[in-house]
Each structure stands twice: as C-alpha cells, then as structure tokens.
Amino acid sequence: MEIRWLGHSAFEIITDEGLNILIDPFISNNPACQIPVEEFNPDIILVTHGHSDHLGDAMELSNKNNVPVAAIHEISLFLSKQGINNIGVNIGGSFIYRGVKFTMLDAKHSSVLDIVEEPLPAGDAASFLITLEDGTKLFHAGDTGLFGDMKTIIGEIYKPDIALLPIGDKFTMGPFEAALATRWIDSKVAIPMHYNTFPPIEQDPSIYANFVSQLNPNIDVVILNPGEYFEYNPENYQD
C-alpha cells in the first residue's frame, strides 16, 4: 500500500489491488499541496467533516471521476442536493466498496458546512478506519482532540496498523496529546498530519516523534513532506 501525504489532512492511498482512496481532499486551496487537482483520479473519496479545509475539492473530483464521496449522513444529504454521488454512513457503521471495508468512527471536533454563505449543520466530526483485503488497517483520525475511546475502542478493538494523526494544536491535538493518542492506539506506524499548513498550526514534527519514542519506542513515526509517499509492507512490521 502506498500512502501519499498531500499536506494538511489530505492523503492519497493506493492499495496493492490498485484502489485509489482520497481522504479529506483539500488540494486546490491548500498552500502545502503543489499538485494540481486535475492530476487526481480517485476511485472513492472520504470526508471526515464539513469544514472547507477537509471537504476541499471533493465535489469537483467526484463529478470529474464519477466516484462516490463517503461522509456522515448530514453531509451526504447536502451532497445529494448538489447532485453528487455519495455514500452516507454514521458513527460505528461500515460499508464495503470494491473489496475494501470502510468504518466510520468517532472524533472530537466541531463540524459545519462552511462552503456556503450561511453555514449549515454537518453532523458530527468523524474518523475512518480502512480495512484492506489482506487485513491491513489504516486509521485516519480526522480533526480531533484526545479522547479515551482512542484506547478502549480504536486501539483495543479495531487495532489499526497505521494511524494518521493531527498534531497542529489550537484546532486539534498538539504534539504531546497526539503522542498519547499514538500510544493508546498502538499502531505499528504513525504519520503526523494537520500541521504547518497555516501559521496557527505550525509545528516541528520531530517533537511529536520524540514524545512517541519516549512513550512507546516500538512505534515507527514516519514524517513525510507534502507530496511524499510511504510504502507500507506488512512483512516489515511483523510482531
């Protein structure tokens, strides 16, 4: 599986079977992403919540590629009114798309649709667990603060292999809280996100990596630059 960070919370995931998954596709207005939005050809798009820096280019890319946008029910209703192909889901629910299982889990954050003049309710903020055909699990936390279910539900029940976690502070967890979340989730690999896009969330990711190393040195923290890939091979992370 290839994981490409696009800056902020946007990721492109390409499975070994060739499924292209785009998460929180904030691309065209993302100062950290230098890749033109026209270059993306997703098979499915995931949106964790309604803020414009996460919904991003989802509607344009859905129309261009005729692919669904998976989002919480309230965002799904909005997308339907715009004529956008979508899959509505809610916290704790799952669906299977082309052999891959997608599970919507909790996040602690606000959510409105702020791309319209009068912001609309957008349900709860969420996270996604992606389970590939070979059993590999990737967790995208969305925007979130630290909360106990990261340990008791996400870590102990779902057991992701890879965790993508925000570290920017102010609007989400900061580096230390994110390191605690990383220890609780206990993934094999952790990739920081949602930082250095704008001045209020400037962070040195090595501080986060150092905190994780102190809490659990067995977790591999992978720090990517926007546009860089990480290739995950389960054979390299055997227990």
Swiss-Prot record:
Covalent S-S links between cysteines: none
Gene3D superfamilies: Ribonuclease Z/Hydroxyacylglutathione hydrolase-like
Keyword Hydrolase attributed: yes
Keywords: Hydrolase
KW Hydrolase (keyword) present: yes
SMART domains membership: Lactamase_B (SM00849)
Pfam families from the UniProt entry: Lactamase_B_3
InterPro entries reported in the protein's UniProt record: Metallo-B-lactamas, RibonucZ/Hydroxyglut_hydro, UPF0173, UPF0173_UPF0282_UlaG_hydrolase
Domain of life: Archaea
A single MF term (Gene Ontology): hydrolase activity
SUPFAM superfamilies (UniProt xref): Metallo-hydrolase/oxidoreductase
Family named by the database record: Belongs to the UPF0173 family.
Cited NCBIfam families: PRK00685.1
HAMAP family: UPF0173
Protein name as catalogued: UPF0173 metal-dependent hydrolase Msm_0779
Organism: Methanobrevibacter smithii (strain ATCC 35061 / DSM 861 / OCM 144 / PS)
